[in-house]
Amino acid sequence: KNILSKFDIPKINVIRNENDLYYRNKIELKIVDGKLGFYEKNTHNLIEIKECKVTKKSINKSFEFVKNMKLENANVTIRANYNDEVLIIIDSKEKPVILNPEDYKIVGIVLNDKCIYGQDNFMEKINNLFFTVSYNSFFQVNNYINLELFNLIKENIVGKTVLDLYSGVGTLSIVASKVVDKVYSIEVIPNAVKNALINAKINKCDNINFILGKVED
């Protein structure tokens, strides 16, 4: 039954993802008793995985590296950028073994919010724009849809003042700043705001006011 049929809602065109496989630039995993995987829905039963078909191949390749860290129990987040460089973020009481990270293009490892190898950020690129992304900063997980979103923004907000709420590293703020007079960008995570200020400078944007704080305030 279509419960929305009584409402006069215009047709919405859904933008299809160009690639159905190997497109996500981030994954969050569990390590339980030395095994890497996801929790089964509504349980704490671990489903061990060897591959995740919706995340980038560079992330899948790094699974081997993560398993070789010899961790028994941990939360692990893996992020990869346009150049297939990889950041690994670990929450664990154990110290990981680090073996041949260069073979997997690992540029940084963060353990309990402390960088223990390489750097705690990397550079992301979409179209002709560059973005510094810290290990705990929000960045959209689908770069293809990001590009489509950028184009949609440019087409619909020319000449206006824009509020970018929960703005992360300033991705949408920077895109909007190219076609509007002023952007107010609000984000609660300090690292993300720090990234956003750098990103505005990299992309030569001087009409964005970055605000550190809660949107609700």
Stretch-by-stretch model annotation:
Residues K1-E72:
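Extended interfacial segments that mediate partner engagement and assembly in macromolecular machines
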Residues N19-Y23, N81, I116, F131:
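A short catalytic or substrate-binding loop motif that flags glycine-/basic-rich loops and adjacent residues
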Residues N25, V86, G159-K160:
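Nucleotide donor/acceptor-binding cores
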Residues I31, E40, I90-S92, Y135:
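Flexible glycine-/small-residue-rich
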Residues I31-D33, A80, K125-I126:
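Generic beta-strand structural signal
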Residues H44-K50, E85-I88, V133:
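Short small-residue beta-strand/loop micro-motif enriched in glycine and branched aliphatics
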Residues S62-G118:
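N-terminal auxiliary segments of SAM/dcSAM-dependent transferases
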Residues K93-D217:
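Rossmann-like S-adenosyl-L-methionine
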